[in-house]
Amino acid sequence: MKLTKFLTVFIPFIAGLIYYIQKYHLRSFYQFDPAKLQELSKQSIALYANDTKALLYDLSDRLVAEYGDLITPVNQDEWVHNNAGGAMGTMFILHASFSEYLIFFGTPIGTEGHSGVHMADDYFTILRGRQLAASANDLEARVYLPGDQHVHPWGHTAQYSMPSGEPCFALELAQGWIVSMLPFGFMDGLFSTIDFGTLYKTVYFTAGRMLKSVLMGKF
């Protein structure tokens, strides 16, 4: 009984504290501007709408020009599969820190899954293809096309789809408690696909980017 009373006070207190820090303090660590990312994305889309590789490399160069050493330039050797929420795609980690990550995510063949519930705001800018999304009370899908930015707020959930048989790639920015998002990215690998090689590479690249950020003074 005492434990129950304690938890009914402690859990809301911790939740409120986390929300307060996120709303009024964590934002001070953010370096990436969602509107700027969308602007840069549209510039690359205008040049390479039908060439995924050229589009991603051009956008990577623009991101490096804008954000400098915060960005790891895209290359062919550090792409990894990502299984999360029942969806499967491939990703390249452009930046990772304790308060933000920036990745290329997508698939040449389509996928569908659950967004997850995250202590972060997510900005998903479509670069090629289209994404469909629906919240629990949506009776029609929301459609996002190249240049559109799908904003997924902290704590919300959605079903999403990159339609089967179609390539779809996006620039994804998450801002919030990034470490709290990591289990969502690892659970399928641990308990479903058992793809420990991909898990190792994901942890290796993520930890490396985070360490780089810390050494640069970026939380």
UniProtKB/Swiss-Prot annotation:
Pathway info: Steroid metabolism; ergosterol biosynthesis
Keyword terms, alphabetized: Endoplasmic reticulum, Isomerase, Lipid biosynthesis, Lipid metabolism, Membrane, Steroid biosynthesis, Steroid metabolism, Sterol biosynthesis, Sterol metabolism, Transmembrane, Transmembrane helix
GO molecular function: C-8 sterol isomerase activity
EC number: 5.-.-.-
Bilayer topology term: Single-pass membrane protein
Localization in the cell: Endoplasmic reticulum membrane
Gene Ontology CC: one annotated term: endoplasmic reticulum
The UniProt record lists the keyword Ubl conjugation: no
InterPro entries assigned: ERG2_sigma1_rcpt-like (IPR006716)
Transmembrane segment boundaries: 1-21
UniProt entry tagged with the keyword Isomerase: yes
EC category name: isomerase
Catalysed reaction, written as an equation: fecosterol = episterol
Major location category of this protein: endoplasmic reticulum
A GO biological process held by the record: ergosterol biosynthetic process
Knockout consequences: Abolishes the production of ergosterol and leads to the formation of more than one septum in some cells. Leads to susceptibility to cycloheximide and to staurosporine, but does not affect tolerance to nystatin and to amphotericin B.
Entry's family note: Belongs to the ERG2 family.
Function, in words: The third module or late pathway involves the ergosterol synthesis itself through consecutive reactions that mainly occur in the endoplasmic reticulum (ER) membrane. Firstly, the squalene synthase erg9 catalyzes the condensation of 2 farnesyl pyrophosphate moieties to form squalene, which is the precursor of all steroids.
Miscellaneous note of the record: In Aspergillus, the biosynthesis pathway of the sterol precursors leading to the prevalent sterol ergosterol differs from yeast. The ringsystem of lanosterol in S.cerevisiae is firstly demethylised in three enzymatic steps leading to the intermediate zymosterol and secondly a methyl group is added to zymosterol by the sterol 24-C-methyltransferase to form fecosterol. In Aspergillus, lanosterol is firstly transmethylated by the sterol 24-C-methyltransferase leading to the intermediate eburicol and secondly demethylated in three steps to form fecosterol.
Database matches in PANTHER family: SIGMA 1-TYPE OPIOID RECEPTOR-RELATED (PTHR10868), SIGMA NON-OPIOID INTRACELLULAR RECEPTOR 1 (PTHR10868:SF1)
The protein's name in its UniProt record: C-8 sterol isomerase erg2
Organism of derivation: Schizosaccharomyces pombe (strain 972 / ATCC 24843)
